[in-house]
């Protein structure tokens, strides 16, 4: 009984703390907005002005960084899930360790996808003149590389997790019955295609973006 009440108190504490942070941020945003409104500076809160005044180089570099970063996180996460299960199951069945290394390779390919796309995107980062920095062409290139990088990075992140979970299941199933490995490997291959789809979509999104001028 004491243990259950202690668990309830801990969950209630976590619940209250998360809500406290949420309402604190909400109150700060509302107070700041009302302050700007009642002091005659309501026009300062202008998201469109923020987009137009922010350098397109920042958006492009941020998209490239997210592309590589999320892809590496997805690959590392998948390798962690697959590797821990493979090592644990390999204690009982050492024969599975070599065969299940293909799952680690599938996870590592996810990071390579992100690196390739980052290299392709970085080729558009040429030096622009100060007069044409905020031209329509440069703004489009910056926004395009930003959202394309997020698309590729998020796809590779999800792909790495999916391949990692499937690879872990394949290792455990192979330890119990070697005939199940090939069947689960087919599912793992379909999961790895998710990263390839994100790569193609990212190339299509940034395909019409010209170099900075």
Curated annotation (Swiss-Prot):
One of its GO terms (cellular component) is vacuolar proton-transporting V-type ATPase, V0 domain. Its main location: membrane. It is a multi-pass membrane protein. InterPro entries: ATPase_proteolipid_c-like_dom, ATPase_proteolipid_csu, F/V-ATP_Csub_sf. Residues 1-14, 83-100, 166-183 are vacuolar. The chain crosses the membrane at residues 15-35, 62-82, 101-121, 145-165, 184-204. Residues 36-61, 122-144, 205-213 are cytoplasmic. Keywords: Hydrogen ion transport, Ion transport, Membrane, Transmembrane, Transmembrane helix, Transport, Vacuole. The record marks 108 as: Essential for proton translocation. One of its GO terms (biological process) is endosomal lumen acidification. One of its GO terms (molecular function) is P-type proton-exporting transporter activity. It is found in: Vacuole membrane. Belongs to the V-ATPase proteolipid subunit family. V-ATPase is a heteromultimeric enzyme composed of a peripheral catalytic V1 complex (components A to H) attached to an integral membrane V0 proton pore complex (components: a, c, c', c'', d, e, f and VOA1). The decameric c-ring forms the proton-conducting pore, and is composed of eight proteolipid subunits c, one subunit c' and one subunit c''. Proton-conducting pore forming subunit of the V0 complex of vacuolar(H+)-ATPase (V-ATPase), a multisubunit enzyme composed of a peripheral complex (V1) that hydrolyzes ATP and a membrane integral complex (V0) that translocates protons. V-ATPase is responsible for acidifying and maintaining the pH of intracellular compartments. This is V-type proton ATPase subunit c''. It comes from Saccharomyces cerevisiae (strain ATCC 204508 / S288c) (Baker's yeast). The lineage of its organism: Eukaryota, Fungi, Dikarya, Ascomycota, Saccharomycotina.
């Amino acid at each position: 009984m004491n243990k259950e009440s202690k668990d309830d108190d801990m969950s209630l504490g976590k619940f209250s703390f998360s809500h406290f942070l949420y309402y604190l941020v909400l109150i700060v945003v509302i107070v700041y907005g009302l302050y700007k409104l009642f002091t005659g500076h309501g026009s300062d809160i202008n998201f469109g002005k923020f987009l137009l005044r922010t350098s397109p180089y920042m958006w492009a570099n941020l998209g490239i960084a997210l592309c590589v970063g999320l892809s590496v996180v997805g690959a590392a996460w998948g390798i962690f899930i697959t590797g821990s299960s493979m090592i644990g199951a390999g204690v009982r069945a050492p024969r599975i360790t070599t065969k299940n290394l293909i799952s680690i390779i599938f996870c590592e390919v996810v990071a390579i996808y992100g690196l390739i796309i980052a290299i392709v995107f970085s080729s558009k980062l040429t030096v622009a003149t100060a007069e044409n920095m905020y031209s329509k062409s440069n703004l489009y290139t910056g926004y395009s590389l930003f959202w394309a990088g997020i698309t590729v990075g998020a796809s590779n992140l999800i792909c790495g997790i999916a391949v990692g979970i499937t690879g872990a299941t394949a290792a455990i199933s192979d330890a119990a019955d070697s005939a199940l490995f090939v069947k689960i490997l087919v599912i793992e291959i379909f999961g790895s295609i998710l990263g390839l789809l994100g790569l193609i979509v990212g190339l299509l999104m940034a395909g019409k973006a010209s170099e900075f001028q």
